[in-house]
């Protein structure tokens, strides 16, 4: 069905939340690398800030510009067939930086699960 009453700002915040969730699995997979490149690009363009209490805040005006610039960057690499440029960008930007890694480590130390696992089947039901 159609999702109604959804703003662009809602989408920005949800997208960032998705990146935070995804990166908890690491940045080794293609999805993890892509998300870290995006996160680092947004960070360097001021699309969000980290507050002193460890929370993050999206700057909606800067996020809009960053999303457009990010799409432009990717499309230019693809359109020009610039494999070497894309690979260089990947190597430089598909990493978890120190501050974010500290925050991820704190989640692990607090035993906050990366993903929820539901026990299912006959054994879980005692059958």
Residue spans for each PLM region:
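Long, well-structured alpha-helical subdomains associated
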Residues: 2-90
